[in-house]
């Protein structure tokens, strides 16, 4: 019997994602000026206010207020009508030094013996539902909002009422064997201007205006947004969006008040959006604002790198990898692999895990080096998912008061590279 499964995403203007992006932009500035920085930066955003807190050990000095305002401005909160404006919001910092007790567990005389920054469990996942080896429900949810943001920033004339905050949700019908059959429901809630005014001050007139706005936005989503998004996908995904697919746009009828004015945002509150959309387990640790000594982040990236390369190598059609660490200890405490019955090799999942341990050095320092994590690469991860993204090289610029602009050529999303496929095929005899 077929079943339904759903994932959601949120836009870069969602309050929790505003917080994530500020935290990661601050991290990037520290990493750009001192790649050995230890950073844990949390952000709270609400009506007209940004609060920064956390712990830092670094030789760099960064302008926290300027960074926060730049991020808010780039996202699109640049009007007083939003009640959260880059140029007028308050920015309060309570960032202080890193605990010496934590630092002693991380730093070692021999860098390769660097201990994990905390205990914890981290998961990585990959499957064959999409070219990016991500769950279709989440991949589509991200793609819808990425394209909506691009329209808002680059082709606003197509949907001139758009504001930064938005959410999406995609439900897919799967076969009993777990294969996507069709897209059952798409939900899009997008913040918008109050662009149709009521004829008079009555509630009836307001209801008519609200209904007309909702109808206009729904038509534009159907006519402008959806064709652009589905054009990115293979034909089987395009066919999955059929005449029976339900489209729900702004189901409450109106979404004018949004962003940090509508809901307070906090760093680390969208961890399922950031990872696998509920299709795989999550260890509970958030990513944004954390330097790679925090295995919550670096080991989760390593686990995705392993899972993706295993699937791409043909070891299995679906792979879940769990890693576990103890604070101050370099080697992982455990490595677990689950292929959910999709393995193409004559080995148990435990034997696959043993080979993974032999192929991949999973000490924190080795992960940092292999994935090039001691670089300012994190702001780009903080919206539209940390996984399923395209690896690419870019040049990033960071403004400083003392050194002018500092340029870094960096490689983004290195954990998405399929650079271990040949090695794995050889080790597994494929």
Task: Please place each PLM-identified region on the residue numbering.
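Alpha-helical support elements that line or immediately flank enzyme active sites
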Residues: 12-31, 126-150, 290-314
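Internal helix-turn-beta structural module
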Residues: 46, 318, 325-430
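C-terminal catalytic subdomain
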Residues: 271, 276-320, 331-338
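A structural-propensity feature for long, helix-poor, extended segments
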Residues: 48-50, 154-179, 313-351
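Conserved phosphate/anionic-ligand binding catalytic regions in large, soluble enzymes, centered on
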Residues: 8-10, 14-19, 115-130, 256-281, ...
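Short, charge-patterned binding micro-sites
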Residues: 39-59, 327-331
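Glycine-rich, mobile lid/loop segments that gate access to catalytic sites or pores
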Residues: 6, 66, 73-257, 388, ...
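N-terminal, positively charged regions that mediate nucleic acid binding
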Residues: 1-40, 45, 421, 427-430
